[in-house]
């Protein structure tokens, strides 16, 4: 199940695990990323808690946790090469995997059509 937030994050949800990243729209708005800071594996976040930070040549921005959960994996590749977020935001540029505290909460997030309306 693919979901989106109004803060320009995407979630690919399989069971109770969500892979989280920023959308192509967010990556375009930020410009070329030069730095990514990810949370620690095992860190727990409440919905909308600051989970990661990205910096581009234009700006720094926080990435928020889209739902309550615990980080189970991070994508070290984007720390080593932040440009992956720009070149493949919904593929190789994912940020972290989150074990959802309550997977049903994802129903309250945006579907792709609603997100596309938001950014139109």
From Swiss-Prot:
Keywords: Lipoyl. GO terms for cellular component: cytoplasm; glycine cleavage complex. It comes from the Bacteria. The keyword Signal does not apply. One of its GO terms (biological process) is glycine decarboxylation via glycine cleavage system. The modification N6-lipoyllysine is found at residue 58. Binds 1 lipoyl cofactor covalently. Its cofactor is (R)-lipoate. Gene3D superfamilies: 2.40.50.100. The keyword S-adenosyl-L-methionine does not apply. Residues 17-99 form the Lipoyl-binding domain. PANTHER family: GLYCINE CLEAVAGE SYSTEM H PROTEIN, GLYCINE CLEAVAGE SYSTEM H PROTEIN-RELATED. The glycine cleavage system is composed of four proteins: P, T, L and H. Belongs to the GcvH family. The glycine cleavage system catalyzes the degradation of glycine. The H protein shuttles the methylamine group of glycine from the P protein to the T protein. This is Glycine cleavage system H protein. It comes from Allorhizobium ampelinum (strain ATCC BAA-846 / DSM 112012 / S4) (Agrobacterium vitis (strain S4)). The gene is gcvH.
């Amino acid at each position: 199940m693919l979901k989106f937030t109004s803060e320009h994050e995407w979630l690919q949800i399989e069971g109770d695990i969500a892979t989280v990243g920023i959308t192509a729209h967010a990556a375009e708005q930020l410009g070329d990323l030069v730095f990514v800071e990810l949370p620690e594996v095992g860190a727990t976040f409440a919905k909308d808690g600051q989970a990661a930070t990205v910096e581009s040549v234009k700006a720094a921005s926080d990435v928020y946790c889209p739902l309550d959960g615990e980080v189970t994996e991070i994508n070290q590749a984007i720390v080593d090469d932040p440009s992956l977020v720009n070149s493949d935001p919904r593929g190789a540029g994912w940020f972290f995997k989150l074990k959802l505290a309550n997977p049903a909460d994802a129903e309250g997030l945006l579907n792709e059509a609603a997100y596309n309306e938001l950014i139109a």
